[in-house]
From Swiss-Prot:
Cu cation binds at residues 273, 277, 322-323. Pathway: Energy metabolism; oxidative phosphorylation. The lineage of its organism: Bacteria, Pseudomonadati, Pseudomonadota, Alphaproteobacteria, Rhodobacterales. It comes from the Bacteria. This is Cytochrome c oxidase subunit 1-alpha. One of its GO terms (molecular function) is heme binding. It is an enzyme of class 7 (translocase). Signal peptide: none annotated. Its EC number is 7.1.1.9. Fe(II)-heme a binds at residues 91, 408. The keyword tRNA-binding does not apply. There is a cross-link at residues 273-277 (1'-histidyl-3'-tyrosine (His-Tyr)).
């Protein structure tokens, strides 16, 4: 994506200086989005390979005799369980640490949060540059880990993305150590970004922009930054203990030496459950702006929406052990975590019903971003989450495909759909060129149908008792697995089509000649700027009359 060059010094910058040494928040946001897209392509490819293997009973592709891309019934195939575990592990690690948070928080957050509050840039521009390049190092370490010697004398670490001991402490090779370092570096870049976001939000708002006149996306990114700042150091401590157990003879998680592997589960999930909301809260902000724009109405209940996000963030820190009902806990503990978990449905419901109220009576325009917002099926994942909040039911569904379906309705049809909504909503603003509407809508329908075909049948597989993370299964599970795999192929084709749409838009899309190419209800400050925005924005700070009429939330 290009940005307008405002003076002769900037015109002399080459490609390397512009993109590798930039401290401009807009350039860094674009870099985050581009790198997250590459990591996402790798992760989605691993997903398709998993679904190829699971389409039919028996092992056809992941063989000890060698990986295959075409099934050969006549050739011998000894199941390669390590390869399967590696594919599952790196799909999770890449998606959780290197795709969704960097795209929503690092990409859209860096680009639009300063614009929404009228700030010239981030508070610490050089720190912003450092956090991006640490992110690149983290992605590189993760890919290096995938290709490095691991267990069973094969590449990669096959322990699952949660890195549970004793699997992670006994896995041979240094692929496991590189994976832990990759997560460490990912945490460092997120913490640095969070410090920058918090400082910018609190200190660089436009004159007269009080806290409760800040747009919802900026609020979402700000609250997410606090969650990152409070939870990631806990994970850092846990995986540091893993490294110590692996390399320095400590026994934090080894029962033979007085350690406790369940301690790691508490550490991981104290970070892991807030992470779910770190992934989804920026998406909430994007969806709020998209719905308000295309319903042609101000968002309903602005203040309750802000308070609901803050409540979700707070409650996210006190429900972690609902992931651990089967690890053993007292009835009193289980009762508390059940009640606390179900309480999160209240602020989440406030957001969902506020979106519905915003659309009610509005003049809805079904452009591509609005389609993604309407298909934002986080609610389905939330409803199934209330189901498995019950300890008695969770004992039945734990480690079955019901959990896979629940989680991916939150992540894939939640956070990922929010990324697509934000991309189509803002790509014209970022690039100065607009996507073809027919192509965006075709991509939406392909992805919507494909994603639901993947994950909705997995609820049935879970109810039938199919365990997750298995390379093979009895023939009784074949019907829904076949449908799920067909959905994966459709979704993968739609993702490749999306990449084509992005490149077509950047190089041949219809030029955007107006600041606001949607309507008057796209009312945040970026819509007062040219498309694309100039290299330096708000060198003269916006006055209240520039934004207050549009931001008068009551």
């Amino acid at each position: 994506m290009s940005a307008q060059i405002s003076d002769s010094i900037e015109e002399k910058r080459g490609f390397f200086t512009r993109w590798f040494m930039s401290t401009n928040h807009k350039d860094i946001g674009v870099l985050y989005l581009f790198t997250a897209g590459l990591a996402g392509l790798i992760s989605v490819t691993l997903t398709v390979y998993m679904r190829m293997e699971l389409q039919h009973p028996g092992v056809q592709y992941m063989c000890l005799e060698g990986m295959r891309l075409v099934a050969d019934a006549a050739a011998e195939c000894t199941p390669n369980a390590h390869l399967w575990n590696v594919v599952v592990t790196y799909h999770g690690i890449l998606m959780m640490f290197f795709v969704v948070i960097p795209a929503l928080f690092g990409g859209f957050g860096n680009y639009f949060m300063p614009l929404h509050i009228g700030a010239p840039d981030m508070a610490f521009p050089r720190l912003n540059n450092l956090s991006y390049w640490l992110y690149v190092c983290g992605v590189s370490l993760a890919i290096a880990s995938l290709l490095s010697p691991g267990g069973s004398d094969q590449p990669g670490a096959g322990v699952g993305w949660v890195l549970y001991p004793p699997l992670s402490t006994t896995e041979a090779g240094y692929a496991m150590d590189l994976a832990i370092f990759a997560v460490h570096v990912s945490g460092a870049t997120s913490i640095l970004g969070a410090i920058n976001i918090i400082t910018t939000f609190l200190n660089m708002r436009a004159p007269g922009m009080t806290l409760f006149k800040v747009p919802l996306f900026a609020w979402a990114v700000f609250i997410t930054a606090w969650m990152i700042l409070l939870s990631l150091p806990v994970l850092a401590g846990g995986i540091t203990m893993l490294l110590m157990d692996r390399n320095f003879g400590t026994q934090f998680f080894d029962p033979a030496g007085g350690g406790d592997p369940v301690l790691y589960q508490h550490i991981l999930w104290f970070f892991g459950h807030p992470e779910v909301y770190m992934l989804i809260l920026p998406g909430f902000g994007i969806i709020s702006h998209v719905i308000s724009t295309f319903a042609r109405k101000p968002i309903f209940g602005y203040l309750p929406m802000v308070l609901a996000m803050a409540a979700i963030a707070f409650l996210g820190f006190i429900v972690w052990a609902h992931h651990m009902y089967t690890a053993g806990m007292s009835l009193t503990q289980q009762t508390y975590f059940q009640m606390a978990t179900m309480t999160i449905a209240v602020p989440t419901g406030i957001k969902v019903f506020s979106w519905i109220a915003t659309m009610w009576g509005g003049s809805i325009e079904f452009k591509t971003p609005m389609l993604w917002a309407l298909a934002f099926l986080f609610t389905v994942g939330g409803v199934t989450g209330v189901v498995i909040a019950q300890g008695s039911l969770d004992r039945v569904y734990h480690d079955t495909y019901y959990i896979v379906a629940h989680f991916h309705y939150v992540m894939s049809l939640g956070a990922l759909f929010a990324i697509f909504a934000g991309t189509y909503y803002w790509i014209g603003k970022m690039s100065g060129r607009q996507y073809p509407e027919w192509a965006g809508q075709l991509h939406f329908w392909m992805m919507f149908i494909g994603s639901n075909l993947i994950f909705f049948p997995q609820h049935f597989l879970g109810r039938q008792g199919m365990p997750r993370r298995y390379i093979d299964y009895p023939v009784e599970f074949s019907y829904w697995n076949n449908i799920s795999s067909i959905g994966a192929y459709i979704s993968f084709a739609s993702f490749l089509f999306f990449i084509g749409i992005v490149f077509y838009t950047l190089f041949a899309g219809k030029p955007v000649n107006v600041p606001n190419y949607w309507n008057e209800h796209a009312d945040t400050l970026e819509w007062t700027l040219p498309s694309p925005p100039p290299e330096h924005t708000f060198e003269t700070l916006p006055k209240p009359e520039d934004w207050d009429r549009a931001q008068a939330h009551r």
